[in-house]
């Protein structure tokens, strides 16, 4: 299925940043939608946002060809509330998520209300295939698992953050799932989510299904753990950079490269 772009929307925020890209099939059927959310990206850590020590050409392209929103507010600029607001269009506290959702009661600040209507539920009712690839962080158990909140397909991470981008563990636990089955994939999380997204897009295109894909990367959230070769490239380019900054730049540039691969698969 050949795809033509018809709309492009870019969103950015200091604590969480996202981009949405929509496309139409040649016969002008209902558009496919790709919504990308990244985690803990600083507002100034993109070259389109005037950063001088890094390059993010693929994200820049979305900003340049889409709608750029420079004056807006995040009601609660941390992980779970941002995701609840994005998926429902509501103030996060109104759907039960004023703060971060965690499994331990003494550190938990929310419960995603089962009655809240989500974007994938609405789109699914409109004939879309719906998928979440990447980070969920809106619940660990029923009735708040991705497949119960509007997603036909889930391939990703249930929890809040990874302690290691390669083992994908959080405090010793494994939260990587394919739908309701625990999995233990090998590889850097950013690259896994990209590969799974490209495969999903190709599959739905082949079957000519209109799809909504919500791609939620963990990057560039800590730990600062990009592939070593990406750190080496940054340090070779600018030997004066502090090690921590070089790692963050490498993690962001690696993320941008992978976003480019997903967008290319649409085109």
Per-range role (PLM):
Residues 2-14, 18-267:
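Formylglycine-dependent sulfatase
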